[in-house]
């Protein structure tokens, strides 16, 4: 599993562009920048839609004022779903990153297997602060949204 001090893997993921899904390299997102990335088990799921993503959307200006260049939300969903979820949640200040096949999540060692619930392999709920591609903070939530909440990450940035 990835840990503080590790460099994020270089991979290609997807975002929803104006004309459809567009590839984006993790190096383009993280290298030379300070980034807050949080991951959720699934777009449009209750905890993710009522608490996790809205917390970052509401606090986006404060997070960026604390020296963060970008905020990224990642899920093992496709770009169409991530794009629609971002619009639904008014998450204009957040890069909605699709890890459609879960390869990035697997490379991080942060897979959550929800096959017993017919949801397949997803991402664990976490948040990290990444500086120039290197993990500075990694908070993983096993159940409730606490360690990976926007408020907790904002406090860590101060």
Predicted regions located by residue number:
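Chalcogenol-based redox active-site neighborhoods
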Residues: 1-158
């Amino acid at each position: 599993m990835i840990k503080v001090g590790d460099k994020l893997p270089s991979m290609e993921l997807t975002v929803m562009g104006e004309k459809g899904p567009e590839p984006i390299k993790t190096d383009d997102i993280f290298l030379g920048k300070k980034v807050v990335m949080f991951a959720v088990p699934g777009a449009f799921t209750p905890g993710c839609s009522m608490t996790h993503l809205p917390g970052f959307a509401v606090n986006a200006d404060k997070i960026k004022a604390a020296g963060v260049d970008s905020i990224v939300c990642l899920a093992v969903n496709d770009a169409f779903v991530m794009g629609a979820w971002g619009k639904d949640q008014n998450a204009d200040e957040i890069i909605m990153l699709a890890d459609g096949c879960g390869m990035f999540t697997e490379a991080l060692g942060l897979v959550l297997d929800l096959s017993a619930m017919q949801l397949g392999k997803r991402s664990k709920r976490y948040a990290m602060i990444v500086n120039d591609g290197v993990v500075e903070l990694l908070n993983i939530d096993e159940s409730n949204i606490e360690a990976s909440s926007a408020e907790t990450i904002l406090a860590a940035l101060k």
